[in-house]
Amino acid sequence: MRQIAFYGKGGIGKSTTQQNTMAAMAEMGKKVMIVGCDPKADSTRLILHSKAQTSVIQLAAEKGSVEDLELDEVLVEGQWGIKCVESGGPEPGVGCAGRGVITSISYLEEAGAYEDLDFVTYDVLGDVVCGGFAMPIRQGKAQEIYIVTSGEMMAMYAANNIARGILKYAHSGGVRLGGLICNSRNTDREDELIIELARRLNTQMIHFIPRNNVVQHAELRRMTVIEYDPKNEQADQYRQLAKKIVDNDMKTIPTPITMDELEELLIEFGIMEQEDESIIGKAAAVA
């Protein structure tokens, strides 16, 4: 069994990419489980055709404790027999959402949820923002990480931060970076830029996913593209990504770059202009 995790900036299309890719894997005959590690509990909605799956934390609160839960209450099978679990989290402003991830994964292990699987995938909130969300990395639960990014500065900034988190635990937990997935925003020279970023991070751009409106059409119906329009070229993009992950033998310890190096890269590719110190802090009327 391989345990992988998808990380990336919030709003980058991580959950959509993860669900479509796992759908393609299941279509290939792989036995897959998705563990959502986001308080929004939206990591399985396209597989289950639901708004949000009832989470481990929510059910535990209703029952009294995690120990009172039955596995079939939190683990739901969706399309192609994909097993789905959402860790969930507390109400906004109350408690630590990262604790939900820790509690849920521990419960799933004890309850035997990981038996007879080829792939377990963790869909993790945004950046590596706290120890709880970093748990799949920190405790070696996820052996390989895929970072969803784009040619936009903040997406690349988040990717570099995540690489830094992987590096921190690479020697103690054995986690490795499997590659960058470019979820295209149609920015200039985007594929070249992400290939170069990957090179500097000591990894690969494992796949470039072109922008296609069929993804949104499928999402409105709470479906993956694989199910909604299986013959669409976008469905083939996810199939290609799934196969590349299955066959991937390039799992590395990343080499994060500095903020200055990232800005130099963006300037080199024309995404950012060279900073003119003489105009910093000057209003339009003065400049």
Curated annotation (Swiss-Prot):
Its EC number is 1.18.6.1. Its cofactor is [4Fe-4S] cluster. The keyword 4Fe-4S applies. Keywords: 4Fe-4S, ADP-ribosylation, ATP-binding, Iron, Iron-sulfur, Metal-binding, Nitrogen fixation, Nucleotide-binding, Oxidoreductase. It catalyses: N2 + 8 reduced [2Fe-2S]-[ferredoxin] + 16 ATP + 16 H2O = H2 + 8 oxidized [2Fe-2S]-[ferredoxin] + 2 NH4(+) + 16 ADP + 16 phosphate + 6 H(+). It comes from the Bacteria. Binds 1 [4Fe-4S] cluster per dimer. [4Fe-4S] cluster binds at residues 96, 130. ATP binds at residues 8-15. Pfam families: Fer4_NifH (PF00142). The modification ADP-ribosylarginine is found at residue 99. One of its GO terms (molecular function) is nitrogenase activity. NCBIfam families: nifH. PANTHER family: LIGHT-INDEPENDENT PROTOCHLOROPHYLLIDE REDUCTASE IRON-SULFUR ATP-BINDING PROTEIN. The key enzymatic reactions in nitrogen fixation are catalyzed by the nitrogenase complex, which has 2 components: the iron protein and the molybdenum-iron protein. HAMAP family: NifH (MF_00533). This is Nitrogenase iron protein. It comes from Frankia casuarinae (strain DSM 45818 / CECT 9043 / HFP020203 / CcI3). The lineage of its organism: Bacteria, Bacillati, Actinomycetota, Actinomycetes, Frankiales. The gene is nifH.
